[in-house]
Amino acid sequence: MRLLKKMSPELLVILDEYKKWFDQAVNFGHGRLKLPVDEKRIDGHTLASATSTEYLESVMKDSHRGIPEVALVTDFQYTSLVPVRFRNKSAELCDELLEFLGAKFNAVHVHYPTGGFMGWHSNWDCPGYNILMSHSPDGKGFFRYRDSVTKEIITMEDTIGWSCKVGYYGGKEESEDLHYWHCAGSDSPRQTLGFVIPHKEMWEMMIEEIEG
């Protein structure tokens, strides 16, 4: 996974307009709105435990399906009881980004509360070329992965504001060198949008659009 050095002004306008709406919506009225999370997916974990080397080793030994088995996030499309206005606004944003990028579908749009996480997983249930756009208000979030060749655990700290990472997630039947174990978390509110693109040429064209 590599971090893109820049994002196009046109793309940032789309993302910033959404973030402005989101911040106003969660801070409307008395106190900050607490978005719902799927309590069952937490499974007793914390940010520290779900992103630890010990947890990675345990997941790699079991019959992992590819998806995160533990998480503390709000998935705007799939978490129960997400307010309709947030679900609809997420869908609008994803549609606008799909049109901008020329992609066919997005894989995920999630909000991390303070202390939120997605535990170690491989995404080998949905292999392909990936684009991840994340927002951090203060750089206190991170993306962590295991280098499939060196076996080194590498942590990519968030930058302040929007950032974009791109890479490839291999399928379960592909070479182990293409398996991409990763996790993420944040000590402050964070959002991530993920896109999966099946064809390398299309993915490379989308990266050009993103970088402007």
Model region roles, listed by residue range:
Residues 1, 119-120, 135, 189-195:
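Nucleic-acid-interacting cores, centered on viral/eukaryotic replication and modification enzymes
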Residues 1-73, 78-80, 187, 200-212:
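N-terminal auxiliary "cap/dimerization" subdomain that precedes the catalytic jelly-roll/cupin core
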Residues 11, 90, 126, 139, ...:
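Residues that cap or initiate secondary-structure elements
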Residues 67-131:
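Extracellular-facing segments of soluble proteins and assemblies that are Gly/Ser/Thr-biased and enriched
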Residues 144-212:
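Catalytic core of Fe(II)/2-oxoglutarate
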